[in-house]
């Protein structure tokens, strides 16, 4: 397990507990009470740290290398029924954007999401979860296919942003994202969006328009990353903590501002500490959202979605 800087007290206590247990196993010394005290201190420390996370610390947790990515979520949600689909039928298949059909229980869904890599080689293969225009066009192709066959859509969002390279701009990155936003706003099937990691800027918005937008507890959603914001305002990444607070990018901030509809709770310490529980909770929230939407007529579904987004950004003096 890799520990973040603010988790070091937990790491130290775990090491102490391991040493205590080894001493008890390898000698005749009774260390039961000592181990019990360390365990209690460990639990108290975890509650204190994870119960008082700053915005920047939640950003760090959203990027934890052990945190489950999109494919892992889909695999656990669909229990072996996932059939991946490829290509945008215009340019090529973008490995940073994945999608396909799968079932949760007896209900079919079209899944779409950004995929990061689990190691250096895979991160390069997946372009670090930064889709090109063909990725967003593939996502739209699959969503339009879902509309044709009346299949609800689930998007899993985890990206540091759309790929900013010149070749992406030449192929119409801005147009691809804008087109997705337009088409998702009027898609005639339920759309459930789940932010499972990073939700950065237009890269997230390109698959982020839905009837229900859910955020996992330790994720973020913003027009810009804290580091980039800091580099623009202060010409340095040193102020990323202040930028994270100012951006109001946490799940609690987004719920308060009515940008997202619900927060999916995570196990203590983050989704990577207990993946099975995290997967189960995500499944429950997806099905809950779908059950709220499935009986709506197409007209009411689209009208409610448009009304929801029309109300965002209201300002009262």
From Swiss-Prot:
EC number, as in UniProt: 2.1.3.15
GO molecular function: acetyl-CoA carboxylase activity; ATP binding; carboxyl- or carbamoyltransferase activity
Reaction it catalyzes: N(6)-carboxybiotinyl-L-lysyl-[protein] + acetyl-CoA = N(6)-biotinyl-L-lysyl-[protein] + malonyl-CoA
Listed pathway(s): Lipid metabolism; malonyl-CoA biosynthesis; malonyl-CoA from acetyl-CoA: step 1/1
Top EC group: transferase
GO BP terms in the entry: fatty acid biosynthetic process; malonyl-CoA biosynthetic process
InterPro entries: Acetyl_CoA_COase_a_su (IPR001095), ClpP/crotonase-like_dom_sf (IPR029045), COA_CT_C (IPR011763)
Recorded GO CC terms: acetyl-CoA carboxylase complex
Protein's cellular compartments: Cytoplasm
CoA carboxyltransferase C-terminal domain sequence ranges: 37-292
Alphabetic keyword roster: ATP-binding, Cytoplasm, Fatty acid biosynthesis, Fatty acid metabolism, Lipid biosynthesis, Lipid metabolism, Nucleotide-binding, Transferase
Assembly, per entry: Acetyl-CoA carboxylase is a heterohexamer composed of biotin carboxyl carrier protein (AccB), biotin carboxylase (AccC) and two subunits each of ACCase subunit alpha (AccA) and ACCase subunit beta (AccD).
Family: Belongs to the AccA family.
Function: Component of the acetyl coenzyme A carboxylase (ACC) complex. First, biotin carboxylase catalyzes the carboxylation of biotin on its carrier protein (BCCP) and then the CO(2) group is transferred by the carboxyltransferase to acetyl-CoA to form malonyl-CoA.
PANTHER family named among the record's database cross-references: ACETYL-COENZYME A CARBOXYLASE CARBOXYL TRANSFERASE SUBUNIT ALPHA (PTHR42853), ACETYL-COENZYME A CARBOXYLASE CARBOXYL TRANSFERASE SUBUNIT ALPHA, CHLOROPLASTIC (PTHR42853:SF3)
Protein name: Acetyl-coenzyme A carboxylase carboxyl transferase subunit alpha
Organism of origin: Flavobacterium psychrophilum (strain ATCC 49511 / DSM 21280 / CIP 103535 / JIP02/86)
Classification lineage: Bacteria, Pseudomonadati, Bacteroidota, Flavobacteriia, Flavobacteriales
